[in-house]
Amino acid sequence: SQYQYNIPDHYDNGTFIDPGVLVDDDGRVYVYCGFLGSYMCELNGDNMYEVVDGSYQTDIIPVTETEDGFFEACSPRKVGDTYYLIYSPKIGSRLAYATSDSPTGPFTYRGYIVDNGADYPGGNNHGSICQINGQWYIFYHRMTNGSIMSRRGCVERIEILEDGTIPTVE
């Protein structure tokens, strides 16, 4: 692969914002990103900038016209043998997740973890899950002061059920 910067036709080839990185148990490194379309690739772990030939994929979370369709902000995690992608869907007040048996997908939409409601109709939500001392949490942000520029960090306990689902935080 050849690294290129500021490709003029970047919208035709994807908009690569809000990257999330997963280092798998075998040491392989995967990057997930996107805006109105999801992308992933494997990086050469020796230099961390070269894309492994043949690894680039588009629409790892299927593009849909529904409110759960991918918008931006991929955050990958591995829980047991299941790969999770937490992302901001088209309804920006929510954090959705999709799962797969492989870091390269295919990923299947599973539901919402957080819904901020009508905090700010033009805002979005970014965040991820993390296990601390055996307890799983979701870290995310909400709008405050009725402004997209005023965000406050939040954390909630979550539960990952045996079937891999994560009930929505109430």
Predicted segments — roles?
Residues 1-170:
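Carbohydrate-active catalytic/glycan-binding domains of CAZyme proteins
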